[in-house]
Every structure is written in structure tokens, then in C-alpha cells.
Amino acid sequence: MKRLLALLLVLVACTPALAAKKPPYTYFRVGNTGDVSPTTSPGIVLMGGGTDVDAAFQWMCGLAGNGDFLVIRATGTDAYNPYIQELCPAANSVATLIIPSAAAANDPNVAAIMQNAEAIWIAGGDQSNYTNFWTGTPVQTILNAKIAGHPVGGTSAGLNVLTQFVYSALAAQGATSSQSLADPFNRYLTFVRDFANVASLVGIIGDPHFVTRDRMGRDLAFLCRVAANGWSSAPRGVAVDEQTALLIDGSGNATLVGNSTAYFLQAPGPAQVCAAKTPLTYLNVGVQRINTSGTFNFNNWTATGSTNYTVSANAGVLTSSQPGGSAY
């Protein structure tokens, strides 16, 4: 009886510890532990996935006044921490915040961590997690507040959520160009809007991995759906290839860094045929392609040093006005 009583007392004593819950988020930080408040400037990075582009992170660190650099993601690890710290040795700190649920996104500690960041990077992953977990939470609110005066960027899924119109990828797999041209309302094409409030990216839908994964056809379907949703009568798209990043300053002027190209699509109006279970017809969508020697002005939608042409989908068949017929 005494032994049983002793065991019960031990269990009672341990109850608070057993009841203590693990935080719904995970946080890793390297560098200084104290907060700093340097002068910052706004800027947006749209990175096309694949190997990260060093120059893009260095640009962000400069705009952040070498303050606290924060990576946010829904899954994954802290692999960015040593990489960014090496690129930006003067940065006060580099941290990764994993926010895997709405509960985590509503945690006051998550909000406090984000509030103290001078630069925010949205890692690649699954953009449906970002829109499902973070929409309507302090994560979204603080992210948009930071966009107004701080550098913010994203790669792959992180790129997707920074444009006004978002391919939300709610299905189990991403849509391919062949699927999208054959049926622009196929179940893999899902969309949301207004997750991020970036002035230069209003009226635009974005796409990464562009050339590498042959996404021109699906981007025409994106534009058709944006118009069909009533979101824009002449929709626009920005697409960035892998190992490449578009750097947009606070005035809406963009340069490109990395190894490949970026594309700026302008539809002349709604698609001629944009219907469920029907091949897409969308004629004469304008394309401006730039490499690292070109620039782009989002205020007047014009590029310098660009190659300009049109692409069309006719009954689901993609064609281009370029010599040789390449869509890219």
C-alpha cells in the first residue's frame, strides 16, 4: 500500500510536466540572440526553384540592413540557416520557423518572431499548405505588413503565393501543360487570390520551374482561368525558370540574376474557348523574355533587352510565333 501511495504521489508530481505541450511550431536560429532594428528597404524576390541563387539572398540581406533574416516554411528543416549565414556574414541572425498548421500560425510566439525579422523568405514546398494553414492568421497579416518596407521573397511554392492570383495546387499532384491544354478546368487546376499584397504583382499569376518543367501550356490555362473567374479581363503572368531569380525593387523595377530566363505574359483578353472538358483555345498571348542582361518595369509592363513574341493554344495545341516555333 505504501508503495502504491508513493507511486501515485510521483505521478501527481509529474503531471504538470506530462501535460506540458510541445509548441506547434519549430524554431531554429543561428547568429546573435539579441534583436536589432536597422533601416530597411522594400524588395521582392521571385525565385524559380531548383538550386538557390546566391545573389538574391545577398540582395535581400542588403535591403534588410543586415538585420534578422527569417525563413518560413510549413515542412522541412533548417538547411537554409548555414547557407544564408555564409552568404550574409554580417547579418545579425538567420532563423528558420516551421509553421505546419493553423494552430501554429496563430501562436503568439510565431507572431513575435516574425515581427522582429528584417527579411522574410518563403521556402519551397507545397503552396497549398501555405494558403491553407496561414490565410487569415497573424502569419499572413505580418507578412503583408513586412512587404511594405522590408525585403520578402520566395522560391518555387514561395514564389506562387506572392502574386495576387495563386495556383494553389490543392490536388495531390501539380498540373502539367498537356493536362491543362486538354482541359483548363481539370481537377489539378485550383486557384485562390490575395494571399500576399505586393503592389507590383497585382493582377498577376506566377509560376516557377518554368522552362525546366515545360509550363507554358499550363500558364495559358492559368490566364484563361483568371479571366473566367472574373478576376481580370486581360490577365498577366510572370514565370521564372530554375536557378534564376527576379529582383523587384520598391519602385517596381526588376533585374534578373542566375542562370536562365524569366517570362512576362500578357493576354489580349479572355480566351476564345475556356471551358471544362474542352481543349483550350487562347490566341496571341504576348510574351516578353529576358535573361540577366534585361530588365523589366512592372509599372508599364515593358522590358529592356527582351525577346518579344506571341504564343497561342488552338484546340489544345500550343504554337509560337518564334522562328522554329519554340514556346520558350
Model-identified regions with their sequence ranges:
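Catalytic-core regions built around general acid/base machinery
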Residues: 113-116, 136-150
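Glycine/threonine-rich flexible loop motifs
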Residues: 127-137
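ATP/NTP phosphate-donor binding region
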Residues: 52-56, 63-112
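Catalytic nucleophile loop
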Residues: 123-124, 146-166
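Sec/Tat signal peptide C-region and signal peptidase I cleavage site
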Residues: 15-19
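Sec-dependent N-terminal signal peptides
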Residues: 4-13
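C-terminal and late-domain segments of enzyme folds
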Residues: 20-66, 88, 168, 172-328
